[in-house]
Structure formats: structure tokens, C-alpha cells
Amino acid sequence: METYETSIGTQSYPPTLFPPPLGTGGFTTSGYIHALVDSTSNSNSNSNTNSNTNSNTNSNSDTKIPIVQISDDSHITHDSFKPYMEYHDASHLRNRNISKADQVESTEVMEQFTQWSNYKMRSRSPTINAKPIRHTSQRRTDFTSKNELSKFSKNHNFIFHKGFLKRQHSIRREDRQAKVRSRFRSKKELTSVLNYIELEQMDIANVLASQPVNLHAIRNLTSRDPAVTPIPFLRSQMYATSSRPPYLRNRSISRKLPKSQPGSLPTTMPATATKTIKQNSTTPTTRSVYNKNVGRSNTSPSVLYHPKRRGKLNTKSHARKEQLLLELWREYLMLVITQRTQLRLTLLCSPGSASNESSVCSSNASDLDMSLLSTPSSLFQMAGETKSNPIIIPDSQDDSILSSDPF
């Protein structure tokens, strides 16, 4: 233990710990800190301790941890802090050099395989103090009158005024989170362009990017409040429109046509079905409470791109898929057990074995193999056995295959 003299008395601390700061542990706040790094004073202060303490302090003196002495001498100046500050700066510089050396080694390794320096230079952000790029102002107002347009349209001439169809790349638009570069900023600009276009004489090949055109047909309605609802009496291509307002419609998320059995759908729609449809459309149903909260359908992009949210909405379908995976895994394990049992029976009934029943096994080997492959569960139900007490085929004493496991 190391001793420290104060204005109050002598206090001892462990050799590996520094004394408490000023204002704590009975010290006065008017004290000053002396950093004494001399190793001789360290050895002299430890001469009166026991042998166990000497061994600890000698090992501690090798590391040259500075001793902090607190006193109330008013003549001490800030120059006494220099040894301690020099020690602190030296340790800080040493740690920085070590981390810098590790960084250089990792950079050299990256340079062996990639152009890491070039990539790092490109990824650096531009300087903050750089001045923004200035552009000349562009006029975007269309001053063309209708008389002028009608005059030039007779001769199929066009008027391109200053600033026609030009986009100004401003700094504010570049800093937006959603960079949507619209062709026209206002309805007036779109109208001024459409005045020069004749939609009746326009060739559709100039508008479409590719030759084939995809036309999507409605098969499954999955929106929350669909305006078109399927009727089970009609065919899959025919749908009936709903005349009820949105708050009176059924709020089921998934709306699919039921699977029709062959021969169940008639060729023509019966008269009873038309009557029921008319009655349902004329007689209003009981008004349900309208939910003002905005809900998302099952086909919204947020549901499709976030599996966690999709699992919350479709808990039943997730449980059904999980049950299907468990059934497939169980069937796979049963098939593996069956094949290993079949291999063992084939080796036991091989012609090289010395058992007396080799001829019987070889005659019935094909039938047994087919039964095992076709019905795996029948393996544990032969001779009145159950799954808890399966059949175990013991090894013969004269058999060349020595194994204690049944499979």
C-alpha cells in the first residue's frame, strides 16, 4: 500500500489506484497536484511495507506509474504539472502511432486486391466552404397568344419561345430526398405543349417504347373496398359492379372466386340468380360503422417489401405455410429412415450371408422393397407394432456385418 500525506492526516491507497480527486475523501479544495515520476522515490516509499506488498510495488515501479501527491503549499506553480503532462502526451502519441500503423497495414492489404485509395477519394464529400454553382436565369413563361397559335397551326409551323421545354437544375431540387424530375412543373406548361400536338394524327409507335403491349386482366380482387365484386353464379371472366357506397361494402381483404367443380356451373345464368342480384342491389343492408383510420390493402408496396408486416396481416397463411413445411420435413425424414431400413434388409438377405432364411429373404426382397417405398408409415405397423415400439431387426451371429444400431 502507498501512503500519501495530506493536511488532515496520512491515508493509504492500493498501489494500482490513484487517490480520490480534490474535494473528496477528506482533502481540502485548496490543494495542488504534484506529478513525481522519479522511480527512486517510489522505491523509498515502499521500503517499510511487507514482502507481499514489496513484490506488488516492484512490479508496479517497472511500469512507472506517476505518484500523485496532494499538499496545501501555496508557493507551487503550474510548472509542477509538466512531468505528468509530458507522460500523458507521450502515451497518447504512442497509442496514436499504433492505431495509425494498423490502419496503414489494412490499407496496404486492400490495395493488393482493389483500388481502395481511388474509391476512398471519390467517396469523400465536397468541401463545405465551396461556393454554390450559379446558373443564368431561364424564363419559363409562355407569352404566345391563341391568335398566333392558330395562325401558325394552319401552315403546320411551330413557335419555340425562349425557355421552351427547359428544366432548371437548382440546388434545392438536388437536395430533395425523393428526386422526382417531372417534365412539367405546372398545368399551364403541360397545356402549352399540348397545343402543339395533334393526338388524332399521332402515331402510337412513336410513343410506345416496345412493340408488345401487356394488357392485364382482373383475376383476383384483393383491395379493401373494391368497386367490382365477383359473383359465384357467374363464370370467372364475368363480374358484377356494386352500386353500394364504399362504407356499405364488405370489408374482407382477400376476395377470390371459389374453386368451381367440373360440370357444376350452368351454361346460362338461371332466372333465380338474377332476381337475387336485383333484390340485393335494391334493398339496402344494415349500415356498418365506418372506420376513419386509413388501412392498407394486402397488395400495397409496404406489405410486399416488408415480410414482418406481411406476416402480421396474414397470420393464418403464415401458419398454414409453416405447417406445410413441417409436413414436408416429416415426410423427408420418414423416407430417409425407410431407405436405410431397406438397405439393411437387402444386406441381411444378400447371397453371401450364412443365415438359414437367406432364400426366403431373397425371394421376398422385391415385394418388401416396394412396400417400404410406397408406404413409409407401414414400417412401424407390421405385426401389430406401433410407433412407440418399433420393430428392431437384430444382427445374426454369423453375419459379416457387425453393428448394434437397428438403422
Swiss-Prot record:
Disordered as annotated region, ranges: 41-64, 277-315
Keyword annotations: Cytoplasm, Phosphoprotein
Record GO biological process: axial cellular bud site selection; establishment of protein localization; mitotic nuclear division
Gene Ontology cellular component terms for the protein in this record: cell division site; cellular bud neck; cellular bud neck septin collar; cellular bud neck split septin rings; cellular bud scar; nucleus
Superkingdom of this protein's organism: Eukaryota
Residue stretches of biased makeup (Basic residues): 306-315
Compositionally biased intervals (Low complexity): 41-61
Residue positions of motif SUMO-binding: 391-398
Modification sites for Phosphoserine: 260, 264, 300, 302
Protein name: Protein NIS1
